């Protein structure tokens, strides 16, 4: 039997609507974890449908860390001004700005990486593999595998989310689209770090941001 307390708990854990929670629990025969997975799968499907919708509202979120040592500006779009003003959306924008400060991505998504950058990285990785004495027939597979790792480091959406490394930033974005009910798009960002490119004492400001994010979960 599905109780109101079970529905309430599922709603608190997922943010889904009451009827959606009730139906998921019924489908899962009262199994809470299975109901969460059902809601997650439905949410992913719903998010995919919303992904093509035009999003021109939103915010430009600013984050400054450590007395002005790291600064980030990120533009995140949604469909309506109403959603842009919600705490849920504002909190998401803040998390993304802090992610950029901490994890130093260079692009939003892999499609944004210029082809010449990819080819240069591929050449470097190929040379490394050959220098390791790997047989020619396995070098290309190694290069492609290492190139995937490169994308996960430099592309924001493919990075592990610092507050929860079990998911990527793209997973987080998909969850927010499903929960909020509008298309959300991380359009662009810029990141500055004091003294970047200059000879200076080594200080890991990004690690400080990451630590602060984990404390403020």
UniProtKB/Swiss-Prot annotation:
Predominantly, its location class is cytoplasm
Q: Which CDD domains match?
A: UBA_EF-Ts
List UniProt keywords, sorted A-Z.
Answer: Cytoplasm, Elongation factor, Protein biosynthesis
**Region feature Involved in Mg(2+) ion dislocation from EF-Tu, mapped onto this chain:** 80-83
Q: Where in the cell is it found?
A: Cytoplasm
Q: Write down the PROSITE patterns for this protein, in alphabetical order.
A: EF_TS_1 (PS01126), EF_TS_2 (PS01127)
Q: Name one Pfam family in it.
A: EF_TS
Which domain of life does the protein's organism represent?
Answer: Bacteria
Record carries keyword Protein biosynthesis: yes
Spell out the GO cellular component terms annotated for this protein, sorted alphabetically and separated by semicolons: cytoplasm
Q: Which InterPro entries match?
A: EF-Ts_dimer_sf, Transl_elong_EFTs/EF1B, Transl_elong_EFTs/EF1B_dimer, Transl_elong_Ts_CS, UBA-like_sf
Gene3D superfamilies for this protein:
1.10.286.20, DNA helicase RuvA subunit, C-terminal domain, Elongation factor Ts, dimerisation domain
Gene Ontology molecular function: translation elongation factor activity
Family, according to the entry, reads as follows: Belongs to the EF-Ts family.
The free-text function statement in the UniProt record for this protein reads:
Associates with the EF-Tu.GDP complex and induces the exchange of GDP to GTP. It remains bound to the aminoacyl-tRNA.EF-Tu.GTP complex up to the GTP hydrolysis stage on the ribosome.
Name of protein: Elongation factor Ts
Gene for this chain: tsf
């Amino acid at each position: 039997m599905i109780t109101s307390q079970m529905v309430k708990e599922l709603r608190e854990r997922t943010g889904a609507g009451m009827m959606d929670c009730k139906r998921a629990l019924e489908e899962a025969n009262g199994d809470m974890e299975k109901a969460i997975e059902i809601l997650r799968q439905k949410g992913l499907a719903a998010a995919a449908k919303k992904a093509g919708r035009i999003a021109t509202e939103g915010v430009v979120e600013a984050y400054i860390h450590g007395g002005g040592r790291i600064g980030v500006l990120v533009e995140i779009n949604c469909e309506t001004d109403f959603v842009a003003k919600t705490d849920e959306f504002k909190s998401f924008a803040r998390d993304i700005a802090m992610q950029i400060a901490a994890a130093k991505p260079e692009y939003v998504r892999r499609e944004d990486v210029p082809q010449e950058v990819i080819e240069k990285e591929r050449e470097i990785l190929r040379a490394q593999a050959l220098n390791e004495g790997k047989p020619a027939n396995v070098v290309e597979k190694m290069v492609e595998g290492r190139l995937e790792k490169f994308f996960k480091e430099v592309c924001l959406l493919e990075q592990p989310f610092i507050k929860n490394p079990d998911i990527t930033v793209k997973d987080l974005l998909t969850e927010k689209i499903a929960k909020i009910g509008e298309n959300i798009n991380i359009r662009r960002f810029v990141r500055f770090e004091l003294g970047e490119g200059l000879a200076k004492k080594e200080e890991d400001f990004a690690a400080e941001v990451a630590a602060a994010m984990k404390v403020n979960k």
